[in-house]
Amino acid sequence: MNTLYWLVTITDRHSTDALLALYEEHGITVSLRTVGAGTAVRETLSTLGLEKTEKAVLFAMITAETWPGLQKDLRRKMRIDVPGTGIAFIIPVSSIGGKRALQFLTEHQTFALKEESTLKDTRYELLLVIANQGHTGSIMDAARAAGAGGGTVIHAKGTGMEGAEKFLGVSLASEKELV
């Protein structure tokens, strides 16, 4: 199977460690995490007896083979399908810049590398770059030179970076920027 997905999980911050442990059970050892804030209006929260909370936002690369089992466990163990507990969704990935980066991001997951022979015909594409802090300017310079009108920077902390030297030959700082 040659399909990769960018997994996004948003839930309460107190669930972060449990989610990372669940990811690890499914061979997802590399992820990025950051915080967000819920936007529900005060009246809705009050009606439901809830308080405004900070959210954990986790990003990871997963394979098509990994997703069904993870999705099942997100529902069964994390109760992600219960309203108010969070959301998990996947975005198809069409390419990754470099074989070593691909191996690192899919470590411990089954993935058969295969070169795509045809490009997907899409009107828009989402380009994500994960970089050490401080490189956003050069990334955006390159993106603008290629026609991008702008971008968004998300500050995150990398997890599972211990194995980075094995694949990339360099140590990675845990503080990241997702552009």
Language-model-detected regions and their locations in the chain:
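Positively charged, small/polar-rich N-terminal and surface patches that mediate targeting and assembly
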Residues: 1-179
